């Protein structure tokens, strides 16, 4: 009760929370021969921590798939030429981390360990097997090669050893023993002045989530995970960093713009919001203390919406009732959604207008400032919308980023109108029918029938081989 009163007094003015964190790497660390091997099989710890394990397992109940491209086909155009134009689902329970990265069309249909479109780094937030491999191979060894190389090795879903030092005496005694299991994340926290071993308990809780719930990119020939925080964590800081190193994730196939793809920057947006500024952590809102059948308190590992545990989350600080807070959150979510759609409409036109300019004979020099505006507009839009909980974490920052994106998109279209006029084009550039996901994918030349068929063959033939090999090697219990 005393803790609740203290927290209520401390955070009385707060209204929203929803997610997590990040990092930045320097030299990669070699593997240590002295450390105990990471145990990646989550069920190993079920007898020792039964309540935590069963609640973690309950994330499998969060099974619904929401197709973001079907909901908003504009995204297909904005990501033309990038795997996200094939497939993009909203997030679901941690229990599906490995399943979803295998099944997404973005990872392709590799036949061999050296095949496929994506690097090993795409496993990095999916499994405690990642921590095990980094420990065994070192970071250079882990990151080397294609995504398919990790198939027989990375088989256990995101779980215990991702967040806890499961080999420690503290963990054996029932204490949290939270840790940063990804060395690149630990270095990143140090880079922004937050060394994990010197951080307070509340900061450490959010840092653990921030190993994955952050913006990142794949750096260098080895495609190692790096967080773009060298200049700071605001959208403009990261944009400046990426521009300085001339980095792009891909080139939009319509406009030929060198693009940036934001990932899931929950830590950055949470840090910018009222909850982050008042040290209300990811755990406070998404993993509250609850009671088991015997009345013992434990941390609920069924990570989810704070409103699902209102009495143990929001009500610890807020005096408003659940319905009142839900109404406020819904209004902010709608405001962000409305501006998001307006920005997307401008960007869709900009990509097709840029294509028309190229087709009309525009030069690289003429297009450079236009493409820069498109790049910056879409980056700011993407960083806002890729953080699915931004309406909870930092609604004001979300609207600010989207407003800035709208301005940049308008600048691009104004310059395009002037350039097109010099090429004798004064009429509006028509758009193809992109009213559905399927029509939008057809408009950018995707053969979805072939892509889906190849994926299904991969799931039927390659994935079972991975699992058989993992069982033979003792990496899977069943």
UniProtKB/Swiss-Prot annotation:
Write down the SUPFAM superfamilies for this protein, in alphabetical order. Multiheme cytochromes
Residues annotated as binding heme c 2: 160, 163-164, 301
Residues bound to substrate: 216, 264
State the pathway, as annotated in the record: Nitrogen metabolism; nitrate reduction (assimilation)
GO BP term (any one)? nitrate assimilation
Per UniProt, heme binds at 122, 125-126
Task: List positions binding Ca(2+).
Answer: 215-216, 261, 263
EC category: oxidoreductase
Keyword Oxidoreductase appears in the UniProt entry: yes
User: How many and how are cofactors bound here?
Assistant: Binds 1 Ca(2+) ion per monomer.
The source's superkingdom equals Bacteria
Q: Which GO terms describe its molecular function?
A: calcium ion binding; heme binding; iron ion binding; nitrite reductase (cytochrome, ammonia-forming) activity
Could you tell me where this protein is found in the cell? Periplasm
Q: Name one Pfam family in it.
A: Cytochrom_C552
Keyword annotations for this protein?
Calcium, Electron transport, Heme, Iron, Metal-binding, Oxidoreductase, Periplasm, Signal, Transport
Question: Which residues form each disulfide bond in the chain?
Answer: none
- Residue positions annotated to bind heme c 4 are 282, 285-286, 393
- Major subcellular site: periplasm
So where does heme c 5 get bound? Answer: 275, 314, 317-318
Family, similarity comment:
Belongs to the cytochrome c-552 family.
Q: What does this protein do?
A: Catalyzes the reduction of nitrite to ammonia, consuming six electrons in the process.
Q: Which protein are we looking at?
A: Cytochrome c-552
| Organism this protein belongs to | Salmonella typhi
Q: Which gene encodes it?
A: nrfA
């Amino acid at each position: 009760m005393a803790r609740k009163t203290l927290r209520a007094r401390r955070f009385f003015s707060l209204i929203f929370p929803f997610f997590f964190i990040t990092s930045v790497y320097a030299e990669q660390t070699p593997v240590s021969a002295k450390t105990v091997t990471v145990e990646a099989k989550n069920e190993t710890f079920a007898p020792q921590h039964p309540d935590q394990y069963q609640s973690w397992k309950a994330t499998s109940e969060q099974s619904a798939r929401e197709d973001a491209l079907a909901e908003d086909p504009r995204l297909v155009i904005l990501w033309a030429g990038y795997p996200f134009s094939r497939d993009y689902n909203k997030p679901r329970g941690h229990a599906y981390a490995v399943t979803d990265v295998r099944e997404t069309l973005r990872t392709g249909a590799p036949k061999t360990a050296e095949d496929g479109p994506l690097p090993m780094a795409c496993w990095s937030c999916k499994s405690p097997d990642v921590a095990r491999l980094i420990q065994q191979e070192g970071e250079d060894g882990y990151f080397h090669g294609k995504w398919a190389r990790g198939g027989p090795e990375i088989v256990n879903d995101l779980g215990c050893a991702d967040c806890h030092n499961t080999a420690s005496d503290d963990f054996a005694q029932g204490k949290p023993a939270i840790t940063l299991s990804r060395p690149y994340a630990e270095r990143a926290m140090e880079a922004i002045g937050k060394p994990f071993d010197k951080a307070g308990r509340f900061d450490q809780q959010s840092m653990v989530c921030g190993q994955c719930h952050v913006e990142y990119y794949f750096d260098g020939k080895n495609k190692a995970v790096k967080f773009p925080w060298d200049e700071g964590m605001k959208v403009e800081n990261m944009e400046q960093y990426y521009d300085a190193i001339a980095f792009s994730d891909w080139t939009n196939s319509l406009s030929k713009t060198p693009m940036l793809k934001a990932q899931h920057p929950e830590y950055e947006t949470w840090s910018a919001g009222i909850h982050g500024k008042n040290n209300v952590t990811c755990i406070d809102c998404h993993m509250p203390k609850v009671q088991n059948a015997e009345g013992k308190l434990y941390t609920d590992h069924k990570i989810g919406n704070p409103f699902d545990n209102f009495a143990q989350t929001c009500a610890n600080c807020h005096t408003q009732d659940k319905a009142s807070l839900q109404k406020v959150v819904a209004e902010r979510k709608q405001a962000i959604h409305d501006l998001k759609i307006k920005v997307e409409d401008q960007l869709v036109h900009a990509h097709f207008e840029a294509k028309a300019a190229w087709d009309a004979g525009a030069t690289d020099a003429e297009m450079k400032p236009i493409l820069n505006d498109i790049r910056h507009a879409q980056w700011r839009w993407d960083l806002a919308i890729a953080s699915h909980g931004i309406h909870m974490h930092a609604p004001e920052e979300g609207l600010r980023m989207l407003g800035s994106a709208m301005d940049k998109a308008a600048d691009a279209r104004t310059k395009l109108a002037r350039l097109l006029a010099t090429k004798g084009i004064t009429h509006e550039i028509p758009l193809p029918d992109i009213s559905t996901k399927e029509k939008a994918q057809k408009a950018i030349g995707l053969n979805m029938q072939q892509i889906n068929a190849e994926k299904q063959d991969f799931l039927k033939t390659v994935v079972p081989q991975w699992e058989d090999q993992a069982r033979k090697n003792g990496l899977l219990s069943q």
